[in-house]
Amino acid sequence: RCHMEQGLLGMAFDEDFNTSRTLLISYIEEGSCDGPNDSDLILASIKIGESGLLDPSTISPLRAIEQPYRNHNGGHLIGIGDNQYLWGIGDGGSANDPINNGQNNSNSLGSISLFSYLNGEIFPVLNNTENDPYVLHHGLRNPWRFSLDDNNMIWIGDVGQNCWEEINLVPLFERKNLGWSIKEGFQDVEEGGVCDENIVQ
């Protein structure tokens, strides 16, 4: 790989893994080393072969997220039960979110997305006909790691730009706008990247 944040970014087991021998994976598709390499973020299924290793010939893409730039890909993937999964997706890259994806609910960039996986296909879980039906939480820059605790609270690690590295704690199904790119942490986003003097809270 010749660019940052490339390759395999996330993996989760199919809930019926013992029978299906299937995993869900999240990765950046291979792109050229020349130019921006704005390759798509891919969600796919893959099977374990008879050798006990992943069989590349069984990869089946399920969803592709167009990445306008080469960084902020997110990609973390966890199962939460009932055949449902959370998928972290970055804002598409570059600085200051130039396309305003973090505050745009019509696409999945800058979000924690929620989907179900059944019979080899994915489906949205949310009843959302006005915006992207997969978006659960938005306003994120690059949620590359997160975890669900025993109280159904999501701990979301979001990579900051100039001043704040965020850990957001939110209820699983209580949809939240986490601020980016209007806010970075507790302060307004400014083009100059000027940070408040007291930035640890």
What are these regions (language model features)?
Residues 6-8, 84-201:
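Beta-propeller domain segments
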Residues 1-96, 145-148, 152-160:
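Acidic, Gly/Ser/Thr-rich repeat motifs that build Ca2+-stabilized beta-propeller blades
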